């Protein structure tokens, strides 16, 4: 990776290094090492669970949607979405955050009084700004998960802080997440700014704009914590352990 692509015209041919034609990219990262996806997120999430005294098992979404794995009997679901969003690959679209089969499985789980923690940079915009979105997708996001979209591609300084809410489990004053490209951890450069929906409350705010919401929580027949900051993007293990502890305490509080 050398920088953002600026030439997308397939008719532009290579002339020289100054005019490279189609596929031309900026070179501002030519001398930098940029961290990619290490696919170690189940380990990072699982380690935080273990540090808080809990065991865990992991599986991919497809194992749930095709019936190979059942989530009904678990006290808590930690849904890892990272920077996943529906993407055109060749002629097909893949990586939708909440495909229909997953929506059904999660709703069945919540109907049994379950607890879901879901974190992903595009957790709201992948549905609400998707031209192929269906009414049922919007209902699932806003009515079941209890979250809406305030602004997509939100620019932050990488700090998030606790909001004033009735949920006393969430009291850690601030966290930091990685938002700048670097060699150690993948960066979340432009996450969603969220809004509460159907009874949820803000629990984390972006530090550079206290009106912008980074996470919401809902307590009713079931409980949800929805964050646009991927859990694994928090910069230190201490912060991840603390955030996971607060989520667990919220789920366990009657």
List PLM regions with ranges.
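Aromatic-Pro/Gly-enriched surface loop or interdomain linker
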Residues: 1-76, 245-254
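The substrate-binding groove and active-site-proximal loops of carbohydrate-active enzymes
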Residues: 28-37, 79-97, 230
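Stable alpha-helical elements in mature extracytoplasmic
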Residues: 41-45, 98-105, 240-247
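Extracellular/periplasmic catalytic domains that process cell-envelope and extracellular macromolecules
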Residues: 50, 69-73, 109-112, 195-197, ...
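A structural signal for short, well-ordered beta-strand segments and their strand-loop junctions
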Residues: 57-60, 111, 117-120, 226-227
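Solvent-exposed loop/turn segments at secondary-structure junctions
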Residues: 63-66, 81-87, 116, 122-126, ...
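A glycine-rich, often tryptophan-bearing local segment used as a flexible ligand/cofactor-contacting loop or short
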Residues: 85-185, 200, 205
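A glycine-centered loop/beta-turn motif at secondary-structure junctions
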Residues: 115-118, 148, 173-254
């Amino acid at each position: 990776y050398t920088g953002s692509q600026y030439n997308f015209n397939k008719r532009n041919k290579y002339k020289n290094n100054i005019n490279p034609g189609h596929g031309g990219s900026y070179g501002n990262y030519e001398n930098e090492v940029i961290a990619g996806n290490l696919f170690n997120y189940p380990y990072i999430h699982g380690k935080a669970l273990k540090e808080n005294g809990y065991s865990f098992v992991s599986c991919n979404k497809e194992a749930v949607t095709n019936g190979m794995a059942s989530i009904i009997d678990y006290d808590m679901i930690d849904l890892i979405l990272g920077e996943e969003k529906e993407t055109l690959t060749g002629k097909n679209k893949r990586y939708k955050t909440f495909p229909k089969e997953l929506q059904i499985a999660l709703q069945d789980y919540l109907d049994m009084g379950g607890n879901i923690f879901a974190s992903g940079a595009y957790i709201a915009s992948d549905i609400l700004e998707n031209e192929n979105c269906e009414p049922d997708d919007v209902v699932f996001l806003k009515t079941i998960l209890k979250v809406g979209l305030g602004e997509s591609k939100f620019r932050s300084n990488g700090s998030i802080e606790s909001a004033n809410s009735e949920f006393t489990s969430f009291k850690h004053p601030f966290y930091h997440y990685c938002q700048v490209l670097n060699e150690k951890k993948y960066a979340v450069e432009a996450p969603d700014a969220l809004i509460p929906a159907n009874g949820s409350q803000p629990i984390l705010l972006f530090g550079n704009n206290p009106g912008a919401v980074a996470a919401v929580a809902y307590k009713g027949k079931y409980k949800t914590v929805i964050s646009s900051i991927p859990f694994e993007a928090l910069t230190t293990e201490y912060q991840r352990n603390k955030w996971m502890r607060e989520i667990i305490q919220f789920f366990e509080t009657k």
